[in-house]
Amino acid sequence: MKVIQLYIIIFYLFSLSCNSQENIVEQINPNLFGFNTSNTFTYCDVNDTSFTNKVQKIKPNVLRFPGGTISNFYHYDEKAYGLDISEISDWNVPKFTKRYNGLIKEQKKRNHNHNYIEDFILLAKKNNSKVVLVANIISSEDDDIINMIKRFKSENIEILGVELGSELSNRAYKKYINSVDDYIHLAQKYSNIIKKEYPEIKVGVVSAPIKYNMPSRLLNWNQKLSEETFYDAIIHHSYLKVIDGDDDYGLMTREDEVSSTKKAQFDLYKKRIKTYFNTGFVKEIIKYNEIFEKEIWITEWNLQMSKTTGNTLLQSLFVSQYLLELLSNPDLQNISIATYHNLAGRDISGSVFKGIKGGFEIHSTYYPLTFLSKIFENDIVRIEKEVKDEVFIYDCFDSTNNLKISFDINWEKNEFILSENMGTDSVYVTKYLSEDLFDMSDEEGKL
């Protein structure tokens, strides 16, 4: 029998102020609370207030458009994402052709005859979100990205930066990007196009994953890129692998058979996540800092996507702690933009919302993300972290040094707790919890 799914209690505490003598207070970076929008507008309707009201409960500060891989084939003046299947097939990547044939079929089925930039603008305006754009640098007209920038500026939507392609270090693109030199040629061309019209807009380049047994195509990718000066930031995609098996750019492609119980299996995943937050995350970023003297944009992050961990309590606790580490860890402050993968789509392991016939489902990450949005509602300027055994506590203070909210990620009791100071010595407490880390949420996001 499961414990209570989502409940609220009120209790009383005294003296919620902090006596710290901190003199300089840095504002928490709101650009770390962002979301990728790949496939969001194909499977979810921005004219459906039941959907947009849920998004507004999260209130994303940043949205990424068009998204991930799809950005490399996006065309501004065409229907939906403007996909041209003959153009995509030319790369000789069967999974691309299959995926985008299916997406085009779905768009036609739903009579989506407008470009999805219209839906994106509507969603961004509803949430007062800034935008990170991804330029198609492999198949678009030269002025496509300029027209996109002009459109967002005409709508008074702030552009944080432009990514020069998405994951173009991936071997899927080796037919025409066989080396970092090929990528630099394309990226510099589009950087020059953007900077000529809009010199104030930052551009980011695609870094290569740093891992053992680097393929020869990637061996000198980062080093050569670090010697260039035409860009402002590097782009890193961060997907933590906790499942044994094979993975490829954020997705588990094969999982080893598991003979242990599900509880033992997820306890192992928990151990790997805790190790990551204790040392691994910082080490991951330091490796890039040692090569590049640039800010870092993490424009996709999540657990490696898998039906095993997707939509579980484990995933929701991971997502909560990842964001809190981004916002509070001084060793991660070179990360200036972060967008979670993904806001909405048709998958179970990547998206907060899953589009279904006649509506959408809510996944386990939703309620914790609404908790975390409280950080920006309360004008938090500092987050202090404390660790007690398997409990990670994040205390959040305002500019007058008052403790406004606190988050407890309790890996022992399998719960995420939000405590809000309501004044007059009262605290409002909300919990998201379940008996087991492998418990999955129902279609309303409850465990």
Q: Where do the model's predicted regions map?
A:
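Bacterial Sec-dependent N-terminal signal peptides
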Residues: 1-21
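N-terminal catalytic cores of secreted or lumenal carbohydrate-active enzymes
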Residues: 22-232
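Flexible loop/turn segments at secondary-structure boundaries
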Residues: 41-44, 70-74, 140-141, 169-171, ...
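Aromatic/acidic polysaccharide-binding cleft in carbohydrate-active enzymes
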Residues: 71, 297-391
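Structural beta-sheet core signal
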Residues: 133, 164, 205, 298, ...
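Noncatalytic carbohydrate-binding groove/subsite architecture in carbohydrate-active enzymes
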Residues: 180-316
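Carbohydrate-binding surface patches
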Residues: 388-426, 430-436
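C-terminal beta-strand-rich structural cap/linker in extracellular carbohydrate-active enzymes
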Residues: 443-447
